[in-house]
């Protein structure tokens, strides 16, 4: 399994102090069957606790996930700042997930080199 962050998500994670290990824990929870919301098209929404707090008032992360293959952390937000994503945004995210999941390894290498994605 390879773990990636999109550039905008990386900025969000740094700003909020979210460590990479916490992101890997989110995926481990999903692999054990704890999926908060399957939004379709390989797009999932998972809750992520703030440091020292619970999940209910924490963060929501949108990720593109195919079990045993790849995960891309695409978007994150604090629940206090945003209730949910719009249908329009979800449509865009599904298309982005489709494109990223179909990329061959060579293309991922180029994206990594150019800073479009960051590997965890």
Name these PLM-found stretches.
Residues 64-118:
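Enriched for short, Lys/Arg-rich terminal
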Residues 1-18, 113-120:
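Arg/Lys-rich, positively charged N-terminal/basic patches that mediate binding to nucleic acids
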Residues 16-18, 22, 42-44, 95:
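Sequence/structural signature of beta-propeller domains
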Residues 37-77:
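Basic/aromatic recognition patch in beta-strand/loop cores that engages polyanionic ligands
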Residues 32, 39-40, 117:
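A charge-rich, low-complexity, intrinsically flexible signal that marks solvent-exposed coils, linkers
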Residues 1-2, 52, 101:
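Surface-exposed, interaction-prone regions with an acidic/low-complexity signature
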Residues 7, 19-28, 50-52, 91:
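Polybasic/polar functional segments that serve as interface/processing modules
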Residues 4, 18, 57, 69, ...:
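Charged, alpha-helix-enriched surfaces in structured cytosolic catalytic cores
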């Amino acid at each position: 399994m390879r773990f990636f962050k999109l550039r905008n998500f990386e900025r969000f994670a740094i700003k909020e102090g979210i460590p990479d290990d916490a992101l890997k824990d989110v995926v481990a929870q999903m692999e054990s069957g704890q999926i908060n919301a399957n939004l379709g098209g390989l797009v999932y929404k998972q809750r992520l606790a703030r440091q020292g707090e619970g999940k209910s008032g924490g963060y929501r992360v949108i990720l593109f996930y195919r079990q045993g293959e790849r995960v891309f952390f695409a978007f994150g937000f604090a629940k206090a700042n945003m209730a949910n994503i719009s249908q329009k945004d979800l449509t865009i995210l599904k298309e982005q997930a489709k494109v990223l999941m179909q990329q061959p390894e060579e293309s991922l290498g180029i994206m990594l080199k150019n800073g479009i994605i960051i590997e965890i």
